[in-house]
Amino acid sequence: MQRNSLVNIKLNANSPSKKTTTRPNTSRINKPWRISHSPQQRNPNSKIPSPVREKLNRLPVNNKKFLDMESSKIPSPIRKATSSKMIHENKKLPKFKSLSLDDFELGKKLGKGKFGKVYCVRHRSTGYICALKVMEKEEIIKYNLQKQFRREVEIQTSLNHPNLTKSYGYFHDEKRVYLLMEYLVNGEMYKLLRLHGPFNDILASDYIYQIANALDYMHKKNIIHRDIKPENILIGFNNVIKLTDFGWSIINPPENRRKTVCGTIDYLSPEMVESREYDHTIDAWALGVLAFELLTGAPPFEEEMKDTTYKRIAALDIKMPSNISQDAQDLILKLLKYDPKDRMRLGDVKMHPWILRNKPFWENKRL
């Protein structure tokens, strides 16, 4: 089966020794070069950029409004598919005999990661709007990411939560692998944070509540995300946000401990930077870092040099700005504990005074 042809392909390169991601300095006001797209490019009615493949470079997108379609137009999950056969079939959807890139009209580029790009696409025959993550097989093999890719697909397709992006399946051709996912109209939280600056308590508390809700669900299924950051959070209508990018996620029963150092440097926990074993509580630490960044515009331990960042993380060297409210400071400091056992549990995050005080002012009432 074609799915296994990718997984079992003979390796021609060793895995890189470091699996962390270095973020550029996140001083948002003074670093306009960090904006991935200009405001004009973010306009859904702006010109659609060139598609992924050379043969589709002149592919027209006749209805520009498809970039603004409501999430109700997005289908229920399309199950895993190869380019030759649909493996799982959803009776509520058209009975696809196959999926390939030719089945989609490609729109604007939504984002770019180390190993792939994400595009807005429309399924030709149904009009469904999705996001399509495109990865080069050559890159997957070069960096020995076959197992990681398969794990990402398996984890994302197993999750069903309003604050987690849905996976509709995947397919592949000779050169590339394509992940078909839920499309969220307002894009990355990082871009919103970069464009408008730090969030107020009302908006930040709403977002932290939703991420805590998603992580609590994942942890109950013994899944650790391991890469929480604004770039991996998408925003839909009515300030509904969804955690995405499960490339570093892993299934980890409570009795197990991990030692792989991965994720983004500014968000690493003390046990990671000190090469100690860790568990799901690293996500709680990252949630504290996220809360700090949403309220200030930059993560708490950010430095130009990686080693200096590591030292500040291990020493819990947190410089708390005076303009952060006392309730918000309390939440952040209870999440950013050196000892994982001392970190606030995600269920308690949702009942914290900072959350409860701001909840009546959220745009939509959360459950």
Curated annotation (Swiss-Prot):
GO biological process terms, semicolon-separated: attachment of meiotic spindle microtubules to kinetochore; attachment of spindle microtubules to kinetochore; chromosome segregation; homologous chromosome segregation; meiotic sister chromatid segregation; meiotic spindle checkpoint signaling; mitotic DNA integrity checkpoint signaling; mitotic spindle disassembly
Q: What is this protein called?
A: Aurora kinase
Q: Which SMART domains match?
A: S_TKc
Record's function text: Component of the chromosomal passenger complex (CPC), a complex that acts as a key regulator of chromosome segregation and cytokinesis. Has a role in error-correction of aberrent kinetochore-microtubule attachments to ensure that sister kinetochores become bioriented and connect to opposite poles by promoting spindle assembly checkpoint signaling. Acts in opposition to the phosphatase PP1. Not required for kinetochore detachment from microtubules during replication of centromeric DNA. Phosphorylates histone H3 to form H3S10ph during mitosis and meiosis.
Q: How does it assemble?
A: Component of the CPC complex at least composed of IPL1, BIR1 and SLI15.
Q: Where is the active site?
A: 227
Subcellular localization is given as: Nucleus; Cytoplasm, Cytoskeleton, Spindle; Chromosome, Centromere, Kinetochore
Q: What else is known?
A: Present with 149 molecules/cell in log phase SD medium.
Positions binding ATP in this chain are 110-118, 133
Q: Which GO terms describe its cellular component?
A: chromosome passenger complex; cytoplasm; kinetochore; kinetochore microtubule; microtubule; nucleus; spindle; spindle microtubule
| GO MF annotation: an example | protein kinase activity
Q: Which SUPFAM superfamilies match?
A: Protein kinase-like (PK-like)
Protein kinase domain segment(s): 104-355
Residue positions where Phosphothreonine is found in the record: 260
* UniProt key word Metal-binding: no
